[in-house]
Each structure stands twice: as C-alpha cells, then as structure tokens.
Amino acid sequence: MTQAQTAAVQPDAIPVAAPTPQRWRVADVVALFELPFNDLMFRAQQVHREHFDANAVQLSTLLSIKTGGCEEDCGYCSQSSHHDTGLKAEKLMDVDAVLEAARAAKASGASRFCMGAAWRNPKERHMPALTEMVRGVKELGLETCMTLGMLEDEQAQQLAHAGLDYYNHNLDTSPEFYGQVISTRTYQDRLDTLDRVRDAGINVCCGGIIGMGESRRERAGLISQLANLNPYPDSVPINNLVAIEGTPLEGTAPLDPFEFVRTIAVARITMPKAVVRLSAGREQLDDGLQALCFLAGANSMFYGDQLLTTSNPQSQKDRALFERLGMRASDADAMSADA
C-alpha cells in the first residue's frame, strides 16, 4: 500500500461510535480533533445525516428573566457580583412580561424558548412564578428550557410537573481546567444537578464554553465528560467565549475559528443523536464559518438580537443566511433524532 493510500484510510481507524459502550476516552476524542479537517467534517456529516435532516435547524430564543447579582464567580460571566462589569442586578421578571417575550419569539420564527436566571440556585419563593412561566410558554406551543443554577430534588420535580421540556446546566469545561474558571461551585455540584434533572424526567441540556484559554486536550476533556454522561445530553450548547470587559477572562486571546468548527464536529460524532446548538459567541463567526458549523453537525442556534447580556446576529441576517444555504427553520418536534 502506498503512503497516499495509507493516509486515505487512517480516519477510518477512529470509530464512529464510542470505542466501548457509553465511553469515550479523552485520548479517543483528541484523536478526532487531530484528524485532517476535511476528514473530520466528512465523518461528522455522515453521522449527522444518519440521524437528522441535514438542512433543518431549530431556532431558539433566550431571555434573561433575572439579570445580574449572581453570587457565583464564573470568570467568563458579566452577571457575577464578583466582577465589575457595570451590569446592574435586576429582580425576577413578571410572568406577563416573560410571556409577552415568548409570543414575540414565536412570531419571529423560534420554536424553543429558553429562560435564564442569574442565580446560584432558585429560592422557594420564586418557584410559583417559574412554574407559571413554564406553563404559559408551553400553552403558546413553544418548547421550554430553563437555566436557574443548581436545583434541589423538589424544585426539579416542580418544574417537571409544570411541563418543563429541558433544563440547562452546563459543565462549562473539563474537570482539569475547571478550577481556573470558577471556585464557588464544584464540578460535582454540576453533575449532581444533572442527576436531579434527569431523575425528575426533564430532558438534559448541557454543554460548555470553549476559548477560555484551555488546551485542545482540555476541550477534548469537556466533550469526553459530556459524551460519557449516562445518557449523554439531549441538547448540547457549544459557546464560543465572549471576552467581556470587567471579567477575569476579558483579555483572553480569541480561539482559532476552525477549532470551534472542529469542536462542533467532534460533539456531533461523540453524541450522534443530540441536538448540537450554536450558542454565545456566534457573532464572532462570519457566514462562511457558520456554514461550516452546520456542515459539522450543528442543528440548532440561538436566534434573536440578544443572549442574556451579550449581542447576537440579527434575526434578518440569520434568515438571509438560511436562504443562501438552502436551509430552513424546523419546529421542535422535527428535531428528534431519526424523526
């Protein structure tokens, strides 16, 4: 066999499915990252087409229902009370205001409505309003997601009874890099909340942030952690760091955009039936790079001009990109794997 022939078959040495049931070693994930770019993209697109319509993307809208004043010290976050970002803390929004925003999101084409609160964890006094928000958004025909921080068992059950479809609680990064980003919440705290959410019967939305100064191996460590959750998340948001002034990470050098695309592809291969979502930082990607992300297996994105406290590409621009690519927005029901 010639050298060229050998090189051509090397990507096939990297398994499409997990090397052992439900297990992806960090070394296996690193091997995926290190494939030639075209080979990685081809593999990811194969996996994507096996389970999803490759030209359909779910549009999600994210609303900050309680902004600022968070007692956690996440190094990337403008809403932490530990950082001087000029953001003023606000109270929890009224239910009617949230439902008005949800109606506007639906009118603009979104099929999923996500509600985020800057808390370490919700207080019991907040639960009636939160469950009313879930019920109200569900009545509009939108898929619902919340991210409220850590949950107790009873709180997870209350949200489940209200009909919450997804709960988001990100791992943020690998266990090895985690301590350089946050000190007020442990990695195990995050895993425990995911267990409570899953036990309550709510779908898990869990991903992370890349470009915080971590190494490629540490990015692979995040993907390995996500892929080895049992089961892996139903929804995987991948955030590209937005280095916000006043946060400890404000001076972080931007990630190579092709590394971001690689991360999307590796997430698709290791979690073949998950919805992989382009999240914060999409504004830093030009149209060509976003198209590569869709080719790599991203099939959902946050849609609208604002994500919590950071900007996002305008909705009209997103619609124009879809038209140029021959892609279309899909409703929530159509995003189930193998649908």
Swiss-Prot record:
SMART domains: BATS, Elp3. Residues 55-282 form the Radical SAM core domain. It catalyses: (4R,5S)-dethiobiotin + (sulfur carrier)-SH + 2 reduced [2Fe-2S]-[ferredoxin] + 2 S-adenosyl-L-methionine = (sulfur carrier)-H + biotin + 2 5'-deoxyadenosine + 2 L-methionine + 2 oxidized [2Fe-2S]-[ferredoxin]. One of its GO terms (biological process) is biotin biosynthetic process. Its cofactor is [4Fe-4S] cluster; [2Fe-2S] cluster. Pathway: Cofactor biosynthesis; biotin biosynthesis; biotin from 7,8-diaminononanoate: step 2/2. [4Fe-4S] cluster binds at residues 70, 74, 77. InterPro entries: Aldolase_TIM (IPR013785), BATS_dom (IPR010722), Biotin_synth/BioAB (IPR002684), Biotin_synthase (IPR024177), Elp3/MiaA/NifB-like_rSAM (IPR006638), rSAM (IPR007197). GO terms for molecular function: 2 iron, 2 sulfur cluster binding; 4 iron, 4 sulfur cluster binding; biotin synthase activity; iron ion binding. CDD domains: Radical_SAM (cd01335). Its EC number is 2.8.1.6. It holds the Pfam family Radical_SAM. Binds 1 [4Fe-4S] cluster. The cluster is coordinated with 3 cysteines and an exchangeable S-adenosyl-L-methionine. Catalyzes the conversion of dethiobiotin (DTB) to biotin by the insertion of a sulfur atom into dethiobiotin via a radical-based mechanism. HAMAP family: BioB (MF_01694). Belongs to the radical SAM superfamily. Biotin synthase family. Homodimer. This is Biotin synthase. It comes from Burkholderia vietnamiensis (strain G4 / LMG 22486) (Burkholderia cepacia (strain R1808)).
